Amino acid sequence: HAVAGGVSDTQDGPFLIQDNFLEATGEEVMFGGGAATLTPSDIEILNNHFWKPWQWMPGNTPFVGGPNGNPFIVKNHLELKNAVRVLVEANLMDNNWGGFSQTGYGILLTPKNQHTQSGADVCPLCQVTDVTIRYTYVSHAGGGIQMVTDLSGNGKDGAPALAGTRFSIHDVVLDDLNKKYVGGGTAFMIMNAWPKNPLNTITVNHVTAFPDPSSHMIIMGNLSQNAPMYGLVFTNNLTVTGQYPVWNAEGSTSCAFEDVPITSITKCFTSYTFGNNGLITPPPAFPPSKWPSNNMFPQTINDVGFTNYNNGNGGNYELLSSSPYKNKGTDGKDLGADIVGLNQALANVE
């Protein structure tokens, strides 16, 4: 890690992590992941450039590894396993890949009651709550943002942590999410494995996302014996759907097993708002009738009206004045991220 915390018996916080160039193999910023009796709070992560050099990724030339030529273990840019009241704003996150214990997602919000080799669950009070991620750009990664409440250990002998709730993600760009970065190329994973107190109250609003065209916009799941998730708000986003837009993550007893967007969303969440999104290039197998109502479905990228799409890799995603999605948000703003505001937020991040 470049910065780590959340594994102690003392009350930590407030934290300000600002104006840094952060480079690390595992995670550039990590809170949690071990034994703790208290949770770090009031954390601001502002105006940082998160970075992993491509020389660390096997297959690249030149390749730089550790002793004996083994590759470094790469996980993600930001992972929260034990943190409350967190603001992540105006960060640039470049280059992340899977191939080890993770699959290339740039950001993980995953409260964890860490399981030790001796069989102990050492952080039942760990939680990730009240997190806002805004005006942030994640690029060149195996996946976008993962929001998961999972059991520790192998999922059989482990135990849940305390809470995963109240996540707000807005005015974020996720581009060049690609399977070539040893991941699924999915924009969002939303999954619960806790029997009680499930993952809940997630807002994804005004996000522009380009998952791998052969992959997914969202992977979701929750076993039928668990308490259902609730409180999903997915609105005003502008995102490619991928070939398999809303896909199952938890096997044959999962709420998302049928892989049909409206069915999966309805079965996985007892309460949700999923509307006023621009869902780009939906495949023929998933026409508008298989989605929640009140969404928009541009059939091609050209129908959106980006200033410069650039194949979803470093483009200018501000909407042209002629775009049919200009000022079409429920708040009167453009669908997708506030690109002008994002560029201003990142102007001095190098």
Where would I find each of the regions flagged by the language model?
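Right-handed parallel beta-helix
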Residues: 1, 5, 10-28, 39-59, ...
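A structural signal for short, well-ordered beta-strand segments and their strand-loop junctions
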Residues: 30-31, 88, 318-319
